[in-house]
Amino acid sequence: MNFSIEIGPRYQNKKCDIFITEATFGLPIFSHPFDKDEIKKLLESVIKNNEKPHLIGVYALGKCQRILSLLRDAGYDEIIYLHGALMKITDYYVSEGLRIGKVKNTSDLNLSELKNQIILCPPSALHDKWSRKFKNPVVPLV
């Protein structure tokens, strides 16, 4: 589960008797920028580096769908490519009503036409042989 101090379209306030969580980055010493500001920076980078793909490491459950939604909310309507490990859970979110626009598996990506696509993948894929097929990618931190 992702936690956020920002209220968005996927925010749900749930009543519970006991709440147990692990929140490594929930301590007050961690100060996180606002999502919309980070998405704006990403989209500015896509425009500035329009000949390079952007590889973004995200977790399959929650973070991937959050980034997809934030990109769409910011007006990005191009195809967003997903690593195969992100497809199944994202398809489930879509079946439950999350509108994320057009996404495709990276296996459908024509590398010869690769320019300024946004490609989401698990963080571990950023450093394995899968990512080597993308020439000179931009790898922003999310």
Predicted regions and their residues:
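A short acidic (Asp/Glu
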Residues: 65-70, 92-93, 131
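Short, surface-exposed basic-aromatic patches at helix termini and helix-loop junctions that form
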Residues: 69-78
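Residue-level preference for the first positions of well-ordered beta-strands
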Residues: 18, 51-55, 79, 116-119, ...
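Short, charged, surface-exposed secondary-structure boundary motifs
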Residues: 5-7, 29-31, 88-95, 114
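The feature marks the mature, well-folded catalytic cores of soluble enzymes
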Residues: 39, 54, 78-81, 96-97, ...
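His/Asp/Glu-rich metal-coordinating catalytic cores
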Residues: 1-53, 57-62, 73
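Short internal beta-strands
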Residues: 20, 78-89
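C-terminal regulatory/interaction regions
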Residues: 73, 95-97, 105-142
